[in-house]
Amino acid sequence: MMILSILATVVLLGALFYHRVSLFISSLILLAWTAALGVAGLWSAWVLVPLAIILVPFNFAPMRKSMISAPVFRGFRKVMPPMSRTEKEAIDAGTTWWEGDLFQGKPDWKKLHNYPQPRLTAEEQAFLDGPVEEACRMANDFQITHELADLPPELWAYLKEHRFFAMIIKKEYGGLEFSAYAQSRVLQKLSGVSGILAITVGVPNSLGPGELLQHYGTDEQKDHYLPRLARGQEIPCFALTSPEAGSDAGAIPDTGIVCMGEWQGQQVLGMRLTWNKRYITLAPIATVLGLAFKLSDPEKLLGGAEDLGITCALIPTTTPGVEIGRRHFPLNVPFQNGPTRGKDVFVPIDYIIGGPKMAGQGWRMLVECLSVGRGITLPSNSTGGVKSVALATGAYAHIRRQFKISIGKMEGIEEPLARIAGNAYVMDAAASLITYGIMLGEKPAVLSAIVKYHCTHRGQQSIIDAMDITGGKGIMLGQSNFLARAYQGAPIAITVEGANILTRSMMIFGQGAIRCHPYVLEEMEAAKNNDVNAFDKLLFKHIGHVGSNKVRSFWLGLTRGLTSSTPTGDATKRYYQHLNRLSANLALLSDVSMAVLGGSLKRRERISARLGDILSQLYLASAVLKRYDDEGRNEADLPLVHWGVQDALYQAEQAMDDLLQNFPNRVVAGLLNVVIFPTGRHYLAPSDKLDHKVAKILQVPNATRSRIGRGQYLTPSEHNPVGLLEEALVDVIAADPIHQRICKELGKNLPFTRLDELAHNALVKGLIDKDEAAILVKAEESRLRSINVDDFDPEELATKPVKLPEKVRKVEAA
């Protein structure tokens, strides 16, 4: 009985930790339990004495602080990692949303499902159906990329006329003031037609002068610039990146010095600016330049510190000394992007966004707005491109035949095709969910990094898969190619707004560990403020949090989550339970990693990356489940849901295993392995059988396939190869049963080629009627158009004569 009572006590302790019962209530329960065991004669009643001696200091604050919290506080202050001003501003900026629940070990799934699904307003829907549809019709991506290296003038004029650059600008200034969800849908539709078109529209609606002015501009700046930006009268760009400082914005060498100078014939207080920027989208054609630089005030003309820090200013590009106009050439996707320079350019102090009072506040301004832009533009562009590619590749896989069968029926093709379909579904879910948060007023900095990384990364992988499937069709550039420019340009999205390697290895968990953790940020603030009282309360909440996640990790691992609560009892029930387990695992691993590695965790980037991977996969899986719920839990969509969640579970568990295999403290790693994997690993990647179901969805018209491609531009036209493939798929499917009937009548397995000749012969023999013959003829036209590629006169490929150096010309002439 003694052994059973000890086991029961251990179970009771575990239950108290599991359910996160408060320290005081837990102490009372333990005392009552021990007293009950004493009365029952199982334990000596004297056990209450040492137990009370142990519990009293924990529950009596003065004793607890002096005996426990104060020594821990002193040690914590010593090991707390140093934080630069830019790091602190990045962490302080923005808010925590759903990722906070995932990080804390006990997600509230009902809260997730209660977030309202965004809807387009009548005005937003009309814009998508009207101006966006027309802009897609006007865009000829081959002309844009190969012949003009720019949007045609009439398309530029159309975008300005219909205020495409003003989606984020408020109506009081003449803007459209669209929701984040509407912006995402616009960009997805545009990106399915032309990456350059989507980038050109997306950048002014992301982080730039318009966004910064609305949040921080003076009334005079807003009244002057915002109506002009809304009309397209001003073209903005924002220059942050320097040759010497790419992702490390805090190290920009560009400078500004506060001084007196001449401006329009008068002596005024201003700044003398010197900068050298590159990779700046819209810089070659910009009329107003947003500029980030480090401002100093050596003469203290502003009355404050000498070193003011990063500052943002708005400068007309007609200002003497401003250099723009030259272009970079990014991977044959020639959107307007280039360098800008200036040396000792004098501008008035009022050019600072927000006026002189905002001097030195530039980095805070940027990071507070960056999460919104990063969370919408890049994920939407990648997602829209993949959605269109998914439909087109699925159609092509059905239309293209080898060995007398559609290549889409071959298992070797099914594997990458399933990844494309699954990623399209997951990416759209992830890109949509973050817009929910933004529309609720959140600025989810960590989520924006997650969505930026995973949408662009999965987008690139999907494009590579599509290229493998389409083969020669994908390689040959021309009007009929729907893939090659996306393939060439995929690294652009990977690189910009925080290169993906940096985002994964430093930003996601680097910010998430502090921003999303329920106690760490407040503990750091308490340590910084030397507030031992606040630290004491946080410390014991933190200890309870760690204990809870340790117990939850072990128990949920032992039971594979079967005992945890879920919001539903259908086919997705087990997924919520698995995610409950992984959330507890992440919380435990995060706390142990921070405790064991301390400040060195910042330098252990691969450990940080794997912790970020776990958080990311939890978000992606929850986004899939949220999408499935929002769309009415259509059972036909379950193969995509299964694929998306199973892939996320597998990758999250793989990241945990890799982390433990490489954790520097092997003893701690061994103990964690027992707690997290008490019965070993369990999650498998999507099976071949599931891949078959998912790949099949893309190859025939159906409601699930339509939901994958929702909102994309699918009108068949000369310049829309995706729309033409959609039309061809319908034509070929209509011809299939007629072809099979002819084969049966003739007793032959005829190839699905030369359908026009087959139609003629079958009509003559009376095997089909005229309508059926017309279907076969149309299918053959569509089939050939789909599988053929473009060819050119040699002179067409050299759009401009090459200017050779004089010496080379002389040699050739000789």
UniProtKB/Swiss-Prot annotation:
The UniProt induction remark is: Transcription of fadE is negatively regulated by FadR. Induced in the presence of fatty acids, in a FadR-dependent manner.
In Gene Ontology terms, what is one molecular function of this protein? flavin adenine dinucleotide binding
Which NCBIfam families does this one have? FadE_coli, PRK09463.1, PRK13026.1
Keyword annotations of the record: FAD, Fatty acid metabolism, Flavoprotein, Lipid metabolism, Oxidoreductase
Any coiled-coil regions, as ranges: none
Quickly give the catalysed reaction.
a medium-chain 2,3-saturated fatty acyl-CoA + oxidized [electron-transfer flavoprotein] + H(+) = a medium-chain (2E)-enoyl-CoA + reduced [electron-transfer flavoprotein]; a long-chain 2,3-saturated fatty acyl-CoA + oxidized [electron-transfer flavoprotein] + H(+) = a long-chain (2E)-enoyl-CoA + reduced [electron-transfer flavoprotein]
The gene from which this protein is expressed is fadE
Q: Family assignment?
A: Belongs to the acyl-CoA dehydrogenase family.
**Which cofactors must be present for this protein to function?**
FAD
Annotated protein name in UniProt? Acyl-coenzyme A dehydrogenase
What happens biologically when this protein's gene is inactivated, per the record?
Answer: Cells lacking this gene are unable to grow on octanoate, decanoate, dodecanoate, or oleate as the sole carbon and energy source, but grow well on acetate, while the wild-type strain can grow on acetate, dodecanoate, and oleate.
Q: Name one Pfam family in it.
A: ACDH_C
Query: Part of which pathway?
Result: Lipid metabolism; fatty acid beta-oxidation
UniProt EC number: 1.3.8.7, 1.3.8.8
* Membrane-crossing segments per the record: none
The UniProt entry's GO CC annotations, sorted and at most eight, read: cytoplasm
Kinase: present as a keyword of the record?
no
Q: Which domain of life does this protein belong to? A: Bacteria
The protein's job, in short, is: Catalyzes the dehydrogenation of acyl-coenzymes A (acyl-CoAs) to 2-enoyl-CoAs, the first step of the beta-oxidation cycle of fatty acid degradation. Is required for E.coli to utilize dodecanoate or oleate as the sole carbon and energy source for growth.
Kindly state a single biological-process term from the GO annotations of this entry. Answer: fatty acid beta-oxidation using acyl-CoA dehydrogenase
Name the PANTHER family on file. ACYL-COENZYME A DEHYDROGENASE, MEDIUM-CHAIN SPECIFIC ACYL-COA DEHYDROGENASE, MITOCHONDRIAL-RELATED
Residues forming the catalytic site: E497 (proton acceptor)
